[in-house]
Amino acid sequence: MSMLLWVGEQKRPLTVDRKSDLVMDSVINYYGDEKPRLAYDPKKLFLDNGAFTANMQGLRLKAERVMQIQETLLPDKTIPLDFPFRAGMPTKQMKNRWQKTRANIIVWQDSTKLGKRLVPALHAWNKKSLENNVRWLQKHVDSDFLALGSLVSARFAEFGGFFGDRTPTRDLIDMLSLAIKSVQQNSDFRVHLMGFGSSPLMLHLGYYLGVASTDSSGYRRKAAYGKIILPGMGERYVGDGSATFGCQRNFFDGQRESDLSMWEKCGCQVCITNKDLIMTDWKARAIHNEFVMKEEAKVAQALTSAGLQAYETYLNNQVFANSSLKFIWEYAKLRRKYPRISEVLFR
């Protein structure tokens, strides 16, 4: 079974030639354009509807406009306009927003030319609604994927979604394993998890837990803040001290020999031709980071094809052996092998 990684791209692309890439973009990047058009040429395009970003920023998207942009760009996959939850919402409001999400799924499926390109979003406010909502999607939606949306746990107020560069927690692992298990038991959908390809550690955690598809825009954000991604590891800072999130210690200040050795072996275009650009040019760092994440996805594909045990052995010995997130990896293995449906997880 193929493991998909969609590379995040924008109106001002890192590179125009994307003919060999699966690309993730967002409606919100084209919302104000009179004539939306792509500035790059992708192999395949997954167009997010922008609802998560709008929800976080308190914006309201018009269904007709979202639909118009999607039909104009005609992506290979896209998400009907959905209504994510926000922290502090009462259950009644969450239920109402799910009903609006359901209604839009039907409209998009029956009244647009997007047809089988649709990837419905799954939202749930407790264990029972998770199971029921998966079953509803299975019955009414003609798609091979669904996208995990708002999953309301007891820690929902502290969790903003799967985007960005958040450090994974046991609660997140619980939430994902529960949702993935429910999807597997109640449908034949494959799971897309938004924004989980920000680092090798996150990417492998997602794939190991059963995610079949994810995307990465974090490679660009990390690069802009002076960070590079090392194969099989996490981010390392090579900038001038202006980082505002994640690892901020300079890579060359007492770095481990293994880190430097891993970087020296990098086969990306920048590292082969001129490594010095990594220190001075964010685009060079972005090219490097994108290359690393694509290579990690290839490793995951090869190992999962050989069987779960082969993948687990690799993660044990290579990716998480010396990682500060090893405790999360050990917890993920427990949840993968001994899945539980916890009443405590959902309120």
Residue ranges and their predicted role:
Residues M1-L114, A332-R347:
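Non-catalytic, usually N-terminal nucleic-acid engagement modules in DNA/RNA processing proteins
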Residues M1-R12, F85-G88, G254-R347:
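C-terminal extensions of enzymes
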Residues N49, D82, S150, S217-G218:
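Short secondary-structure boundary segments
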Residues M89, N96, R117-H192, S198-H204, ...:
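Glycine/Thr-rich beta-alpha phosphate-binding loop at enzyme active sites
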Residues F162-D165, A224-G246, A286-Q301, L345:
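C-terminal helical cap(s) of enzyme catalytic domains, especially alpha/beta-barrels
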Residues H192-G195, G210-M279:
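Active-site-adjacent pocket scaffolds in enzyme catalytic domains
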